[in-house]
C-alpha cells in the first residue's frame, strides 16, 4: 500500500490498556512453554496496531510541524504514550514471573529476557506524568527547531538548506552561513536553554523515582544496552581520544594542503577540496533512478526492497519550510513498510540518505518478513546503526551513479568524514554524562563544559568571534541531545564496525556483503557484541581495539589523496 493511502485512526486508549491488562494476566498464567510463546506473539501483534498509528502520526507531524491536525495527534501520543508504556511494563513483569519464561530465550535468542528485564527496571506508573511532560518538551523543541527560517543570500532558508553555503568556496559566504544559523539560536537562546533545563530536571527526577543515582544510569537501561555499560563506553571514548584524535590531526593537515586554506577556522571545516566538495549529479528523479539501479545490481533482495520503497511512496526527502530537520527511518508495522524521512540540500549528504537510511530500512524490511516478534525485529541502536553506516561503504561500487567524475573525491571525503565524526560523537556522549551527573549546571556552565570537550576531542577547531558556537552552545543544534539522550555514542560504536566492513570490502566485497547480510538478518535476536562476532568483526571495548583499524584507514586515506 502506498504511504498516501495508509489510513490513520487514533487508537482507543481504553481498549489498548484493557487489552494489555488481559494479555498480562494470560501471560502470567500460561501453563506451558508453547502457550507462553503463542501469547508472546499475540501480545506483539496486538501492540503493533497501536505502534502503527503512533508512527503514522509522528511521520505526518514531522513532515509539517505547522499542521495543527497532526500536531494534535502528536500531542495525544505525547500525553498517552507513557500510560501504554507502563502497561507494556506490566506485560514484561508478567512474562518474567512465569516459570516458563526461559522458553522465550530458546525460541527467540539471547536478548528477549534482558530486554523485558530492562523494561521493568526503567518504567513505573510513578513516572507517567513526568514522561508526558518530557514528551511535550521534546515536541516543543522540534517545533522551535523545525520552524527555523533564516535570511541568507537574499533567501529565506531552513537550517538544512544552509549546508551548501557552509561548503561554499567563498570564505565570506561560509562564515555568513554559520552566522545566519547562529542568529536563530541566539534569538531563541532563552527558549533553547529553558527547554533543556526542564528536560534535564525532568529526567533526573524520573531516575531518582526509579531508584537510580542519576539519569545516566537509567538511560543505559532504557537504551537496552546488553552486555556492556558506562565503564566500557568510557574505555571506548578513551580509545578514540588516544588513537583517532592524533590521526585526525595528521589527516586535517593533509586536507588543509589540499584546500589551500593556510589557517582553517571552524567555518572552513566543511571545505574538503580546493575546487569544491563532491556533490551529487542529477535531479531528484535521476538520483532515485540511480538508487534503484544500484540496489538491483547489489543483490536480488535489495532489488526487491528498493522497488517496494519507491513504488509505495516510502521516501520523503526534500527539505521545505515547516518540515522537521534531520533524517530517520521508521517501520510502519501493520504494513511491513519502512519509511525514510530526510532533508536533501544538494550536498553529498543526499546520497548518504539513499545508503544510510536505506540500510536501516532494509533491515526493517527483512525482519518484518520473518517470524521474529515485532519488538525483536530491531536490535539496540548501537547495532541498528551498523546496518546504516555499513551500507554507506558497501554501496561504494555504485557511487559513480551519483557522483560521476567526482566519485573519487566522494570516496575520500566519506572515509575522512567517518573518522572526523568519531571524536564529535564521543564529545556528545561525554557531555551528556557530565550534564546528567551534574544536573544543577547553569546554561553557561554547560556551555563551558562543551568548550572543554572541544579542546579534548577537536583541539583544531578555532571559533574566533563566531556567535553561538564561540560561546559553547553549538551542542543545541544536535537533535539527539534534547530528544533521545545517550543515543549518540551508538553511531560511534556502529562506525567502528562499518569501517571494518569498509576494509573487508576492499579485500573481498562479496564476502563482506554476505557477512553484512548475516548480521542484518539476525535483527534484534542478538546483542551488539554477538552481532559483531557473527560478522567476524572486532568488538571495540578493549584497549588497543582501534589501533589496527585506525592504521588501515589512515593508510587508505593517505594513498587516495587527490
Q: Which stretches of residues belong to each language-model region?
A:
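Inter-helical turn/loop segments and adjacent helix faces that build the functional surface
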Residues: 230-231, 254, 258, 298-301, ...
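Auxiliary, metal-adjacent structural segments of Zn-dependent hydrolase domains
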Residues: 275-334, 347-348
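Long, well-ordered alpha-helical segments
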Residues: 196-207, 212-213, 251-255, 359-369, ...
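Glycine- and acidic
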Residues: 122-123, 181-188, 228-234, 270-280, ...
